[in-house]
A protein has these predicted regions:
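Non-catalytic, conserved peripheral segments adjacent to functional cores
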Residues: 1-93
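Surface-exposed interaction patches
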Residues: 99-101
Length: 101
C-alpha cells in the first residue's frame, strides 16, 4: 500500500464530486442553515478543485503534507491573489463568502 492509499484508508476518505478525496468530520446546523463544518480534503495526481464561489460560510484551507498547493482567489474587488501553501511557507488561507477560488 502506498502513502496516498494509507492516508485515504486511515482518514476514511471518499471520492469528492469535484475531484480529490474528502470526509466531513464535523458539521452543525442552526435553524436549517449550516453554521460550520470541518472536512479533510486531499488532492493527488491530476486532481484539482474547480473555480467556485463561496456562499454563506468562510472556508479555511490548511496544508498538512505533500507538494505546494496554489490557491487562486478572486477577491470582492476583482483582484486575483495566489496563495502558495506548503510545509515551508504559507500553511493556511482564509476564503470568505463572495470570493471565487
Amino acid at each position: 500500500m502506498n502513502n496516498i492509499e494509507e492516508i485515504i484508508e486511515n482518514l476514511q476518505l471518499a471520492p469528492h464530486p469535484e475531484g480529490g478525496w474528502y470526509r466531513q468530520v464535523f458539521g452543525n446546523d442552526a435553524d436549517g442553515k449550516k453554521q460550520a463544518s470541518t472536512i479533510y480534503y486531499m488532492l493527488n495526481g491530476g486532481n484539482f478543485s474547480a473555480f467556485h464561489r463561496l456562499h454563506g460560510m468562510t472556508e479555511i484551507w490548511y496544508h498538512h503534507a505533500g507538494t505546494q498547493l496554489d490557491i487562486h482567489v478572486i477577491g470582492l474587488d476583482g483582484k486575483l491573489t495566489t496563495h502558495h501553501l506548503s510545509a515551508g511557507g504559507e500553511m493556511q488561507v482564509v476564503i470568505t463568502p463572495g470570493q471565487w477560488f
